[in-house]
């Protein structure tokens, strides 16, 4: 299982948080 948390930042500061979890062996696209 792969877990990752990505924080998107912009000139205004924190723009949003993207969370995705993957199980098995499949391609992950962001």
UniProtKB/Swiss-Prot annotation:
**Expression across tissues:** Expressed in fruits, leaves and pollen grains.
Where does it localize?
Cytoplasm; Endoplasmic reticulum
What does the UniProt cofactor note say? Answer: Binds 1 copper ion per subunit. Binds 1 zinc ion per subunit.
Its required cofactor(s), as named, are: Cu cation; Zn(2+)
Segment forming the signal sequence: none
Q: Look up and give the organism this protein is from.
A: Olea europaea
| Keyword terms | Allergen, Antioxidant, Copper, Cytoplasm, Endoplasmic reticulum, Metal-binding, Oxidoreductase, Zinc
For this protein, the Enzyme Commission number is 1.15.1.1
Upper lineage: Eukaryota, Viridiplantae, Streptophyta, Embryophyta, Tracheophyta
Catalytic activity from the UniProt record: 2 superoxide + 2 H(+) = H2O2 + O2
Q: What does this chain do?
A: Destroys radicals which are normally produced within the cells and which are toxic to biological systems. Probably involved in the protection against oxidative stress during pollen development.
Keyword Hydrolase among UniProt keywords:
no
Q: What is its main location?
A: cytoplasm
Could you name the Gene Ontology cellular component terms for this entry? Answer: endoplasmic reticulum
Can you provide one Gene Ontology molecular function annotated for this UniProt record?
metal ion binding
**Record protein name field:** Superoxide dismutase [Cu-Zn] 1
């Amino acid at each position: 299982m792969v877990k990752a948390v990505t924080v998107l930042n912009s000139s205004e500061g924190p723009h949003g948080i993207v969370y995705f979890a993957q199980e098995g062996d499949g391609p992950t696209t962001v």
